[in-house]
A protein has these predicted regions:
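Short, well-ordered beta-strand elements
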Residues: 12-16, 44
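C-terminal cap of thioredoxin/glutaredoxin-like
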Residues: 2-7, 11-12, 24-38, 116-211
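Short pre-active-site segment immediately N-terminal to redox-active cysteine/selenocysteine motifs
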Residues: 18-21
Length: 211
């Protein structure tokens, strides 16, 4: 970031496709929090489901692979952010959480809800497929989720989730997190803070290179 940048600089919009059960999405979210402390940004969270409804049961090989890489990611999160990972159930569906997120967005609380769900799953071992868990998280933000929202039957939130998923397809987003800065720069994966900062500066029009 340019050191002369004023704190009144217009925030850079960052569209983020993310899934709550993705460890790299937790890292990406934490790095966005770090970025927000350095330069004005406006994260807009979009739904992405690594295991959409109708996915086959997770194979034993996939579960073993997740169990193998989890300690490495846990160590990275501990060393970089000082947080202890206590993961929720492997294979938990994020369907209801994404629909709840769109309800939270309508009330101006998407960022807070996103952060709360990520922390509930990754740091508190909660099952975010459990509607009672989501309702409890929502209550901390003065949000109430009825069955229609959490079951994907509420038309407005269901349409918003569908639009997010369709946009991801249109942009050829096949993995998350994925960041689009001001509709100009695309960054894929849990990249270092320095790269996100360069992307934000470039989106703002400052003379930096983004790779």
């Amino acid at each position: 970031m340019n050191p002369t940048t004023s704190t009144t600089t217009t925030p850079v919009r960052i569209d983020v496709w993310s899934d709550f059960v993705c460890p790299f999405c937790l890292i990406g979210s934490l790095r966005l929090e770090q970025l927000a402390a350095k330069t004005p940004i406006e994260p807009v969270w979009h739904a992405f489901m690594l295991r959409p409804p109708g996915s086959p049961p997770m194979s034993a090989e996939k579960r073993a692979m997740i169990a193998e890489y989890t300690p490495k990611i846990s160590a990275q999160i501990r060393d970089e952010f000082g947080l202890v990972v206590e993961r929720g159930p492997i294979g938990a569906s994020s369907f209801a959480a994404h629909h709840a997120m769109k309800h939270a967005e309508r009330h101006g609380k998407a960022i807070a809800f996103n952060n709360a769900v990520l922390r509930a799953y990754w740091l508190q071992g909660e099952d975010i497929a459990d509607h009672d868990v989501l309702r409890r998280i929502g209550a901390t933000l003065d949000l109430a989720f009825d069955d229609a929202v959490l079951e994907g039957r509420e038309p407005v939130t269901a349409e918003a989730v569908s639009v997010d998923l369709a946009q991801a397809q249109a942009y050829n987003i096949h993995g998350v997190p994925a960041f689009i800065f001001s509709n100009r720069y695309y960054v894929s994966g849990a990249q270092p803070l320095e790269l996100l900062e360069r992307a934000a500066d470039a989106a703002r029009g400052e003379p930096v290179a983004v790779h």
